[in-house]
Amino acid sequence: MSHMRVMFDPKTIALIGATEKRGAVGRTILENLLRSKERKIFPVNPHTRKVLDVESYPAIAGVPEHVDLAVVATPARSVPGVVEECGRAGVEGVVIISAGFKEIGDEGTQLEKEIDRIRKKYGMRIMGPNCLGFVRPVLGLNATFLRGNPPPGNIAFISQSGALGSAILDWAVSAGIGFSMFASLGSMIDVDFGDMIDFLGDDGATRSILIYMEGVGNARKFMSAARGFARRKPIIILKPGRFAESARAAHSHTGAMAGDDSVYEAAFRRAGAVRVGEIAELFNAAQVLDSKKLPAG
């Protein structure tokens, strides 16, 4: 089984930065994870023996079972060391919720480079940093700090922006729109849109893919993946950057440079993806796709 498949269907999950502190990200993530009855959850916190009545461990090395997925919610400066510990423990996938990386400047960029060096050393996959995580309603798994779970459905939604992703998720819950996957990719140090399209293209629960994109990541990988699946599964993209204000806003969110918009426009067309211009159009696309009345062919 590939690292991506293990990452998105883990049997064992460690939450590094788990806490009982009310309002803390580490508490909300743990509460969400504990609702997944089919997975073993291991809180990691060196300062306590239990978190929310679940036995806690001082470090991932102390967890008594092999960990498939680690979710990291610790301060940015601690993250390289945490990722190193995950690598030593044989963890296959890491979701870094923590913020304070390239979006804040040079110091954060250096932290990302160190994390990427460690990732390559151990061959693990990393989502984030500065991301919300992912939700797989079809599996009853919520590895984010967002409240509310959308019902299971056939639409996958992928976003770089956490704020936009959160708004879409809130709307989907209120509208009863179902998702096969919700994923917030953040800074895309490793897992990017190409990886997600590859994974979702082969995912039996997914019939269509909606994307909010600030920067494409690995353009060649994205084009290859989109061309491979766009004919079978509609790929609909909202990408800001047609106007200067949109480009600046996108850059401030995740440190992603918007790039030449005409290049993106041509690339989406060649890949067979459909570009929409406004969030309302993305909502409308979700409603149409959720109706399960896709045109033949």
Predicted regions and their residues:
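Catalytic-core regions of core metabolic enzymes
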Residues: 1-297
